[in-house]
Amino acid sequence: MDGIRTSLDIEEYSDTEVQKNQVLTLEEWQDKWVNGNTAFHQEQGHRLLKKHLDTFLKGESGLRVFFPLCGKAVEMKWFADRGHSVVGVEISELGIREFFTEQNLSYSEEPVTEIPGTKIFKSSSGNISLYCCSIFDLPRTNIGKFDMIWDRGALVAINPGDRKCYADTMLSLLGKKFQYLLCVLSYDPTKHPGPPFYVPHAEIERLFGKICNIHCLEKVDAFEERHKSWGIDYLFEKLYLLTEK
């Protein structure tokens, strides 16, 4: 087996300092949508969520599920179709409109009075509500608590210097007996500046460990041909389950 890379061979970089000053503005994220630079979107949905979804839901209905930095994630419809209420936040209005169009869902839009210039887009069925604003403005809307958070492509997209504020925002939205599903990426951060940014286990412990039990459920090889252009030669994705201590 010499020369074959496995997930057990590669140690994590515990140091996140190399990327700490990396910044992408909200305008740059919006430009990615305008220019179609959205390789982060997964048209078929996330394989690990698909694998574990029914286990997480345990046959329950009527849960409130939050999608930070939701884009046009197809998983939002998965939850809605199972009888759950979905709330998302996304800075790109284009991304939100594309979600409803591509999922063949009729919707309405209205201003959010608490945040000038912000809109909320609601499915006609009433169980999907997407806010078009910065994640850091969202607490001003008093959107309540959630039973579950699906964080794929959110924490890894947040500027490293904003992670503590982001984590505190997420924790403020969690209700009792919550399940926080978190996907992060592991690669050599000295070879790629991000985003998506590198988030090691130690960083998750730092951000969430005081409030949450942290369990790594699965680690899979996520390296694709396109990742060679990042200058890296391995990429692993890890799915964590965070629960109430």
Swiss-Prot record:
Q: Which residues carry this modification: N6-acetyllysine?
A: 58
Q: Which Pfam families match?
A: TPMT (PF05724)
For this entry, list what GO says about its biological process.
methylation
Which InterPro entries does the UniProt entry name for this protein?
SAM-dependent_MTases_sf, Thiopurine_S-MeTrfase, TPMT
Question: GO MF terms on file?
Answer: thiopurine S-methyltransferase activity
The highest taxon in the source lineage is Eukaryota
Residues where substrate binds = 40
Q: Name one GO cellular component term.
A: cytoplasm
Keyword Methyltransferase (UniProt): yes
Q: Where in the cell is it found?
A: Cytoplasm
Instruction: State where S-adenosyl-L-methionine binds.
Output: 29-40, 69, 90, 134-135, 152
The entry assigns this protein to a family as follows: Belongs to the class I-like SAM-binding methyltransferase superfamily. TPMT family.
PANTHER family linked to this entry: THIOPURINE S-METHYLTRANSFERASE
Quaternary arrangement and interactors, per the entry? Monomer.
Name of protein? Thiopurine S-methyltransferase
Annotated organism of origin: Pongo pygmaeus
Taxonomy-wise, where does this protein's organism fall, top ranks first?
Eukaryota, Metazoa, Chordata, Craniata, Vertebrata
